[in-house]
Every structure is written in C-alpha cells, then in structure tokens.
Amino acid sequence: MNDSQYNLIAEALLLAIEEAIEDSGVDIDYEGVGGLLTLTFKNNSKVIINKQAPLHEIWVATKFNGHHFVLNNDSWTDKRSGEEFWQFLSNAVSTQAETELTLSAQ
C-alpha cells in the first residue's frame, strides 16, 4: 500500500467511526481534525484515534492504554493482540461510556 492509498483508507475509517458514534444514540462528543479523532464521554474520559501515516497505522489511546492497528486483508488489527479494530473500539467505548454498545462500519 502506498501513502495515497493509506490516507484514503485511514480517512474513510475515521469518517466511519464518526458515523458509527452518531448512529449509536449514546451521548459521546467527537471532534475530528487533521487525521486525529477525539471521543469525549460524559465522565470526561477520552479515546483518541489518530493516523500514523509514516507507519501506515492507526493508533488508539484509551484511558487504560494504547494500541497500534495495521491493515491486514481489508481489516485493521491490533499489532500485539490481533484483535479486530471494530471489536476493540466497541469494547473500549462501552467501558468508557459506561454503557454497552456495538460499533461497526456501515
């Protein structure tokens, strides 16, 4: 994958996250600026998702730890655990929002 392809795919992922948050019906504020998406919850905790263009990765920081995701066969997966991005994000957001929700690209 070249840099242009990465940027298109990563920007599409960030947009899909915004849409999934909006569609969830849960009160989560989000702000996207320049490849960085910040989710802010009622309890003032945050999840920060950002592009790491030089590495062709997506980084996610929760209040607990950080994760690096790489694109493998059209699916973003955690470099350490192998967990799929949307499953991870659903769990992280559910924990920080203190309510169960499932996010996905639609």
UniProtKB/Swiss-Prot annotation:
Q: Which PROSITE patterns match?
A: FRATAXIN_1, FRATAXIN_2
- Which Cys-Cys disulfides exist here? none
Tell me the keywords, alphabetical order. Iron, Metal-binding
Q: Name one GO cellular component term.
A: cytosol
An annotated GO BP: iron-sulfur cluster assembly
Show the PANTHER family listed in the entry.
FRATAXIN (PTHR16821), FRATAXIN, MITOCHONDRIAL (PTHR16821:SF2)
Its family? Belongs to the frataxin family.
**Name of protein:** Iron-sulfur cluster assembly protein CyaY
Q: Which organism is it from?
A: Colwellia psychrerythraea (strain 34H / ATCC BAA-681) (Vibrio psychroerythus)
Per the UniProt record, the lineage of the source organism begins with: Bacteria, Pseudomonadati, Pseudomonadota, Gammaproteobacteria, Alteromonadales
